[in-house]
């Protein structure tokens, strides 16, 4: 079946104007996840912020209680004992100057990037390469740290970085279609709680304005914003 026809069929029974309680929305999304692979369940949250202003940026990291269902490759910039610690914690790629050179040459073989503070003068040169991919280590989200073990295990264990993009939209993968409805609800509520705690001082009016959930190949289902909290 062509993708367009499949999506149209999946939209059947979804009222595009209605706001559904979170649990009901998740049930509908799961029922419509019919691809031949385990689709990712994604949430999109429209926030009452303008990320063009520094005092309205929303960014953070949260460990989802039920993981993401995705196996991440973790890269660590570290030397000596910290490099050994990263390897022992399960990092997939570890290095210093050698890893910087690989990245500069276009070899980026990781989905999450961590660095010890002493490596940042070197890693800073990679801003134009790592930045656009959302991979630049940042102390605010715990990816510039001396706790290499904690950062690697967190990334491997289901931590999700979130960041508001243009137009005030924040998007994140919160699990797989194979997850139970209960686990997906728990993950979304954990993300919503972290996003709420990250509310910037510059945000005025309603903070969480609109919410929708979807699967990789399925239609979006609008959610009552109040049902993703608590």
Curated annotation (Swiss-Prot):
Keywords: Repressor, Ribonucleoprotein, Ribosomal protein, RNA-binding, rRNA-binding, Translation regulation, tRNA-binding. InterPro entries: Ribosom_uL1_bac-type, Ribosomal_uL1, Ribosomal_uL1-like, Ribosomal_uL1/biogenesis, Ribosomal_uL1_3-a/b-sand, Ribosomal_uL1_CS. GO terms for cellular component: cytosolic large ribosomal subunit. Pfam families: Ribosomal_L1. GO terms for biological process: regulation of translation; translation. The keyword Ion transport does not apply. It comes from the Bacteria. Gene3D superfamilies: 3.30.190.20, 3.40.50.790. Coiled coil: none annotated. The keyword Transferase does not apply. Binds directly to 23S rRNA. The L1 stalk is quite mobile in the ribosome, and is involved in E site tRNA release. Belongs to the universal ribosomal protein uL1 family. Part of the 50S ribosomal subunit. This is Large ribosomal subunit protein uL1.
């Amino acid at each position: 079946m062509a993708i367009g026809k499949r999506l149209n069929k999946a939209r059947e029974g979804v009222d595009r104007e209605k706001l559904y309680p979170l649990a009901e929305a998740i049930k509908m999304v799961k029922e419509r996840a019919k691809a031949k692979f385990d689709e990712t369940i994604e949430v999109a949250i429209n926030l009452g912020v303008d990320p063009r202003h520094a005092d309205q940026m929303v960014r953070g990291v949260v460990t989802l209680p039920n993981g993401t269902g995705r196996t991440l490759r973790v890269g660590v910039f570290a030397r000596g004992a910290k490099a050994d610690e990263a390897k022992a914690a399960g990092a997939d790629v570890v290095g210093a100057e050698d890893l910087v050179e690989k990245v500069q040459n276009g070899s980026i073989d990781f989905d999450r990037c961590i660095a010890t503070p002493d490596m940042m003068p070197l890693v800073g040169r990679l801003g134009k390469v790592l930045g656009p991919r959302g991979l630049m280590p940042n102390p605010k989200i715990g990816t510039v740290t001396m706790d290499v073990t904690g950062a690697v295990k967190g990334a491997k264990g289901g931590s999700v970085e979130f960041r508001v993009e243009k137009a005030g939209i924040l998007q994140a993968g919160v699990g797989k279609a194979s997850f139970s409805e209960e686990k997906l609800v728990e993950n979304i509520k954990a993300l919503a709680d972290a996003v709420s705690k990250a509310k910037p001082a510059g945000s005025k009016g309603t903070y969480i304005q609109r919410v929708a959930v979807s699967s990789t190949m399925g239609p979006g289902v609008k959610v009552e914003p109040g049902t993703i909290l608590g």
